[in-house]
Structure formats: structure tokens, C-alpha cells
């Protein structure tokens, strides 16, 4: 109801800070108005799940376009998203593990080459978490978000506040569940007596 659920809320802040005016008009405005939805595609099944400097998804320059190939997973909200913010390695001359090797792209969805192969099962099912295989997906230079080589910085900017928001949300839900259990145990009669 407040349009502040992940992943859209974090993507709004990211677009506000990193997007061009044209990108803000096309992606941020509809997202803020609640008529669009998004996902953030950084996590990968190999080492880049815990270290985004080691992302294997890559982008190869081809004229004024990029050809993207790779594998992402636990991508929250991908099945309902109208666009994705995707992080890919583009600077092949930069040593692996360097912070300047990755670039962020805005991907219109659906797109040819973006394959949602399955939903990854988790305890939290509100937005769903997809496994995505990217095969020869073409994007224009104008779809770069935040400039070449800034994907790691953008990702950290995006995820820092999001991690805090997730923690607040889950702690509040756990506290509410505990309060409900205490209330129930103090007022529940079973076999002629209170549980507590």
C-alpha cells in the first residue's frame, strides 16, 4: 500500500541517485507511481553470491550495444518485473576481483535472452526469487546505469540501505510473532487450565 517493498524501494533510491534524466522519466517515475515493478540482478550461484567483485555475467561491446551472457539467482520479484537493474563484468582488462570491472545495465522485461528458468524455493515467498539465465541479451549503450565500471559502487549503494530495511522488517515480524505467542499462551485454556 505504501509502495515501499523490496526490491522496488531500493531500486527507486538507486535510480534517483544514478540514472540519467531520460532513465528517470522512463523507469523511476512509473516505479514511484506504482505502475511498474523491478528487480535487482546481481547475485550469482557461484562465488559472486558473496563477493560481487567476482561476477561472471559479462557484457561484450558490439558497436553501440552490449551482448550480455550469464547466470543470476535469488532475483527477487523477477517474474513480475517490468525492468531489471543487472550487474555484469564489462572491463575485461581490469583484474578479476577489482571494483572497477562491473557495469550496471537497465534491462527492459521481457527481453529476448532473459530466461527465467525457475523459482528458487525460500521461506519468504511474497515476491518470489528467480533463477535467470542470460543468453546473448542485447542492450543499448543508453541502458548503462551510472557509467561504465561503476557497477560495484552502484551495487553497494543499492544494497547498504536495503540490508538495513530487510533487518528492520524481519526483526519487527519476529517481535510481533513473539508477542502473539505470549498473548496466546497467557490466555489459552487447555484441559481446564491456562497454558502459561
Residue ranges and their predicted role:
Residues 57-59:
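A structural signal for short hydrophobic beta-strand segments in well-ordered beta-sheet cores
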Residues 34-43, 87:
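A short, Trp-centered hydrophobic/proline-enriched beta-strand micro-motif
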Residues 50-53, 64, 77-82, 96-100, ...:
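Short glycine/proline-enriched turns and hinge-like loops at secondary-structure junctions
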Residues 20, 70, 105, 134, ...:
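Residue-level signal for inorganic ion chemistry
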Residues 48, 73-79, 123, 161-165:
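Glycine-rich phosphate/pyrophosphate-binding beta-alpha loops
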Residues 114-196:
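Glycine-rich beta->alpha junctions and the first turn(s) of the following alpha-helix
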Residues 71-115:
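A short core secondary-structure module
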Residues 1-37, 76-83:
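Internal helix-loop-helix
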Amino acid at each position: 500500500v505504501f509502495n515501499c517493498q523490496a526490491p522496488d524501494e531500493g531500486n527507486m533510491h538507486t535510480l534517483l541517485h544514478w540514472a540519467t534524466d531520460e532513465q528517470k522519466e522512463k523507469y523511476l517515475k512509473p516505479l514511484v507511481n506504482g505502475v511498474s515493478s523491478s528487480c535487482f540482478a546481481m547475485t550469482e550461484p557461484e562465488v559472486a553470491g558473496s563477493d560481487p567483485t567476482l561476477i561472471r555475467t559479462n557484457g561484450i561491446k558490439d558497436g553501440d550495444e552490449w551482448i550480455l551472457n550469464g547466470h543470476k539467482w535469488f532475483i527477487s520479484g523477477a517474474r513480475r518485473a517490468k525492468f531489471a537493474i543487472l550487474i555484469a563484468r564489462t572491463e575485461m582488462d581490469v583484474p578479476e576481483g577489482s571494483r572497477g570491472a562491473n557495469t550496471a545495465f537497465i534491462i527492459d522485461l521481457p527481453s529476448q535472452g532473459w530466461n527465467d528458468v525457475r523459482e528458487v524455493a525460500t521461506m519468504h515467498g511474497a515476491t518470489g526469487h528467480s533463477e535467470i539465465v542470460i543468453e546473448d541479451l542485447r542492450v543499448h549503450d543508453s541502458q548503462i546505469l551510472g557509467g561504465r565500471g561503476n557497477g560495484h559502487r552502484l551495487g553497494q549503494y543499492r544494497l547498504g540501505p536495503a540490508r538495513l530495511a530487510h533487518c528492520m522488517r524481519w526483526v519487527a515480524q519476529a517481535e510481533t510473532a513473539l508477542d502473539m505467542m505470549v498473548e496466546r499462551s497467557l490466555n489459552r485454556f487447555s484441559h481446564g487450565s491456562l497454558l502459561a
